[in-house]
């Protein structure tokens, strides 16, 4: 079997003789940016960082911009792939774990931390097999599938919000230092005159529902004294501009905002989605918000995130449906004319902030880095990074047994067996250290 890992060609860092910390993160900015924030802290302390991601994913474009070497695995997500592909999941996972083990043996990380994403699962399991200290950081209140699995094996489970895992350490989600350094809400908002400044954040891809609902709601209010700055993503820019023009609402429509600290400092109120990183920034900046969770988010995790701020009276939650524009109009009618309420929400958000999250995560990583139980690989493993014939026979027998059980089963029964098979694959790996060192069989 061929190696499913691609090693970075980035030149070694001057501190390459020091064992690095390996970050597992990818797929979305919500996983990648917290990892980058922690990488920045570690690098400032003289600790080298290496990254494991997925071929062709967002991290392959973002991470090299920060001079961090990134290795990749040929892997995609397991959710929503249909029954045929689901049936082959155990074999694909086992191959990916072997490939990840190949990378880990080359990099020899002092510790490994998962922020989530496609490559994090195989990378985390390989770390567990090879004895590298494994940590998990879950950004959302509803944990992702990868971090759910890895939390069972991790030394420490860190979270952005309380209540995600039993035995968690709620350290917060990392935010940019310039956002955390903004003045307190009272220093920014008290005594302001002029239009109410509304910041609309659609995320890097934009949010069509916000492009439509915000102009419609503001137009229905009869052109209030409002100044709008709307970040909409490049693909939806023209659509957003047309929507504001048709509603006769003046707005600055921007595909991307480079200086988010300045944008938050300018804003009296924010209308946005409820991704974990965005909410961490709202709290760090200290600004009230109207949150419209992405309805199709996995496990509805954005609603769970939003409920945390709503429970502290730091935000208003509006669900995405056909009546959104009408309900947004009603909420804005109150908030735009009530500066005391906006200040109260901003102060409540600030009390939830954890501006030192990146520093705390780095501290915990380094605490665990000296407590690994790594065992040196056997001579034959060092030579070939291979898998023994006896172990290969066990895996083949297990797969053939499961395949035989699928015949004549209902869809539900097949899915049930598949989940059990996947669990057995993980258990088999954990019971046989060194099995998935990576490479060719």
From Swiss-Prot:
Record's keyword terms, sorted: Cell cycle, Cell division, Cell inner membrane, Cell membrane, Cell shape, Cell wall biogenesis/degradation, Glycosyltransferase, Membrane, Peptidoglycan synthesis, Transferase
CC terms in the record's Gene Ontology section: plasma membrane
Pathway noted in the entry: Cell wall biogenesis; peptidoglycan biosynthesis
Protein name, UniProt field: UDP-N-acetylglucosamine--N-acetylmuramyl-(pentapeptide) pyrophosphoryl-undecaprenol N-acetylglucosamine transferase
InterPro entries with a match to the protein in the record: GlcNAc_MurG, Glyco_trans_28_C, GlycoTrans_28_N
Chief site of localization: membrane
EC number per UniProt: 2.4.1.227
Top enzyme category: transferase
Pfam families registered for this protein in UniProt: Glyco_tran_28_C, Glyco_transf_28
Family that this chain belongs to: Belongs to the glycosyltransferase 28 family. MurG subfamily.
Binding site for UDP-N-acetyl-alpha-D-glucosamine: 28-30, 140, 176, 204, 257, 302
One annotated GO biological process: lipid glycosylation
Organism field: Xanthomonas oryzae pv. oryzae (strain MAFF 311018)
Gene Ontology molecular functions: UDP-N-acetyl-D-glucosamine:N-acetylmuramoyl-L-alanyl-D-glutamyl-meso-2,6-diaminopimelyl-D-alanyl-D-alanine-diphosphoundecaprenol 4-beta-N-acetylglucosaminlytransferase activity; undecaprenyldiphospho-muramoylpentapeptide beta-N-acetylglucosaminyltransferase activity
Membrane topology: Peripheral membrane protein
Top-level taxonomic group: Bacteria
Function: Cell wall formation. Catalyzes the transfer of a GlcNAc subunit on undecaprenyl-pyrophosphoryl-MurNAc-pentapeptide (lipid intermediate I) to form undecaprenyl-pyrophosphoryl-MurNAc-(pentapeptide)GlcNAc (lipid intermediate II).
Phylogenetic classification of the source organism: Bacteria, Pseudomonadati, Pseudomonadota, Gammaproteobacteria, Lysobacterales
Catalytic activity: di-trans,octa-cis-undecaprenyl diphospho-N-acetyl-alpha-D-muramoyl-L-alanyl-D-glutamyl-meso-2,6-diaminopimeloyl-D-alanyl-D-alanine + UDP-N-acetyl-alpha-D-glucosamine = di-trans,octa-cis-undecaprenyl diphospho-[N-acetyl-alpha-D-glucosaminyl-(1->4)]-N-acetyl-alpha-D-muramoyl-L-alanyl-D-glutamyl-meso-2,6-diaminopimeloyl-D-alanyl-D-alanine + UDP + H(+)
Subcellular location: Cell inner membrane
